[in-house]
A protein has these predicted regions:
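Conserved acetyl-CoA-binding loop-helix of GNAT-fold acetyltransferases
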Residues: 97-110
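Conserved GNAT acetyl-CoA-binding A-motif
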Residues: 111-123
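Conserved active-site alpha-helix within GNAT-family acetyltransferase domains
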Residues: 122-142
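Short functional linear segments
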Residues: 150-199, 206-208, 212-217, 224
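ATP-dependent carboxylate-amine ligase catalytic core
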Residues: 172-175, 179-191, 216-302, 320, ...
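Extended acidic/charged loop-beta regions that coordinate divalent cations
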Residues: 270-319, 351-388
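Nucleotide phosphate-binding/pyrophosphate-handling subdomain across enzymes
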Residues: 280, 285-288, 298-308, 312-316, ...
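C-terminal helical cap/extension that packs against the catalytic core
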Residues: 347-362, 376-379, 444-445, 453, ...
């Protein structure tokens, strides 16, 4: 048999389950769902005995299992391996003459972007042939069957897809369309084991620390983070490798009509692609970073084993409110029924909101404490929960982020075991681009994505350890730039404000108003001038801004 058949583990069969008898209404409607771990007992009962090894199959990240229900009774099951291979089909004998078999096959085909295969015998060959499967390989009365899924080639390259996605409207006031889309798509996100990480600052760093430890322990980890620092593909990664352009084109050609029908936003499309890609790649765990707020964020369709809040800051006040309590309520929107909510936030008004929302959802809050003894220098070290932690950064704010990651890891350790050495090595090895990152020596140039009041305050704590400082600053117009510049002026009087191409940018003139700073509307010119500085150059104010600067400097 050819190499592609090696992953077909189960004999594809259509037959009775343990001799049970069912009264069948030939006109009845059937309901379908993607199986979760809560369905284990029902599946075992349906199959009469657990020769299917249900528990292990449901935990296998490469397998997606579909169930057919008649009322509250399972009558059919189909397993899809790697989103490309039908590896198990089982339908109750009394439902052989209904549409269950056909509808299970059609359901599987919705999740396939190119080609679907199955491996069967002579007895069931005709069934698959009736549904346009063709024999690819025959060996010892066993058949490898293939069916090509018809897809219109609307996009020929990634640039076309990116242009299409960018053209979709942003929507932050409602999640209804996306929830309906995912529901009608049988909620594939429920297949993923994931952690949902929100908060104002530190989400990306916390995600990165968590990912690195899990990777050290041998797990395959999917991460969804935003915004992208270098390339838009970077927001979706598996073990640090971004999704490739060809895969995005494949998904776009397959699902564009569905995206358009439900009027999905750019971010919603990207979340859907991430979900499908993580399933296809068979990740052991997925880490989803909230984009904006929580309640109405597109990532809020996931079903996490843990929800996390890094902290609360006054950011995106136009959408989330202008008080800590109102922002906390939006962030707490990711709390799920029965799922704990972990937070490093200490403000009483925020914690009050968290406890209130957790109570509504029959959940509970896990408050974490920061390390007490921290040793600062060119790198940072501390002892925490029995671990000795060495950070490969001088950014003070990474103490809180790494400590939160340690608490996340300890919470999920029962399901994802790791050694203490894995944690210490992973935390040390973790490097997060754009967060107090040195990108040039002589002069020393450090970029930092501080982009709001609290982020700039945290940046200040690390930057004040330096002397002879020059700063290049730019920001979006909806940020508290007045506070950020006041903070930066306490570090240095040598500040150049500039501007970059972004629809929400603040102009250099707007930033400079009321402040004794230099103005240079050409950010590249400002960077070139900074090369003659004899001390340290900090470039900060916006993740979007430093992504451009970072790429420019590193490409030289």
């Amino acid at each position: 048999m050819p190499a592609q058949t090696r992953i077909i583990h189960y004999y594809v069969c259509l037959g009775a389950a343990g001799g049970k008898e069912w009264k069948v209404n030939m006109n009845e409607n059937f309901e379908y769902k993607i199986a979760t771990r809560e369905d284990i007992d029902a599946i075992v009962q349906f199959l009469a005995r657990d020769y299917y090894e249900t528990s292990r199959a449901l935990k296998d990240p490469c397998k997606m299992i579909f169930l057919a229900y008649s009322g509250e009774v399972i009558v059919g099951i189909l397993e899809l391996l790697d989103l490309s291979n039908i590896s198990f089909v089982y339908v109750s004998e009394d439902y052989q003459d209904t549409l269950v078999q056909e509808e299970l096959l059609e359901l599987a085909e919705r999740f396939v972007t190119k080609e679907l295969t199955a491996y069967t015998d002579e007895e069931h060959l005709s069934f698959f042939k009736q549904h346009d499967y063709v024999v690819d390989v025959e060996s010892n009365s066993r058949y490898l069957l293939k069916k090509t899924i018809p897809v219109l080639p609307r996009f020929s390259d990634y640039d076309q897809v990116l242009e299409f996605i960018e053209a979709q409207k942003d929507r932050v006031y409602s999640l209804t369309n996306f929830k309906n889309f995912m529901y009608d798509f049988y909620d594939p996100q429920t297949k993923l084991t994931c952690v949902h990480i929100g908060g104002t600052n530190g989400k990306g760093s916390t995600t990165n620390y968590t990912k690195e430890v899990l990777k050290c322990a041998g797990y395959k980890v999917g991460t969804f983070t935003s915004p992208a620092l270098v390339n838009r593909l970077d927001i979706i990664r598996v073990d640090d490798e971004p999704i490739d352009e060809t895969t995005v084109v494949r998904y776009a050609n397959r699902y564009m009509d569905d995206w358009m029908a439900y009027e999905l936003s750019k971010f919603e499309i990207e979340v859907f692609i991430a979900v499908m890609y993580f399933i296809e790649q068979g990740v052991d765990i997925a880490l989803f970073e909230v984009g904006l707020g929580g309640t109405l964020d597109a990532t809020n369709i996931v079903s996490p084993i843990l929800s996390v809040n890094t902290n609360i800051g006054l950011d995106h006040v136009k959408f989330l409110g202008n008080t800590y309590a109102s922002i906390a309520r939006s962030k707490a929107g990711i709390i799920k029924r029965g799922i704990p909510y972990m937070t490093a936030e200490r403000r009483p008004e925020c914690l009050e909101v968290f406890y209130e929302e957790a109570h509504k959802h029959h959940s509970y809050v896990i408050e974490i404490r920061k390390p007490k003894r921290v040793y600062y220098g060119a790198s940072i070290s501390y002892d925490y929960h029995g671990y000795h932690i060495d950070l490969s950064t001088s950014a003070h704010y990474q103490v809180a982020n790494s400590a939160l990651a340690i608490n996340i890891l300890e919470y999920i350790r029962k399901e994802f075991p790791f050694k203490d050495a894995d944690l210490e090595k992973g935390i040390h090895d973790a490097v997060w681009e754009g967060r107090f990152e040195t990108i040039h020596q002589n002069p020393l140039i450090i970029v930092d994505g501080a982009h709001n009041r609290e982020g700039m305050d945290a940046f200040f704590e690390s930057a004040r350890d330096f002397s002879n400082i020059k700063i290049i600053f730019s920001a979006l117009g909806d940020k508290d730039t007045h506070h950020m510049l006041e903070t930066l002026l306490s570090l240095s009087k040598d500040i150049t404000v500039t501007q970059f191409d972004h629809p929400r940018r603040a102009t250099a003139q707007q930033l400079a108003e009321d402040f004794p700073v230099k103005i240079d509307e050409d950010w590249k010119h400002a960077v070139e001038e900074a090369y003659s500085h004899k001390g340290v150059v900090f470039i900060t104010g916006s993740l979007y801004f430093i992504s451009k600067v970072r790429q420019y400097i590193l490409s030289k």
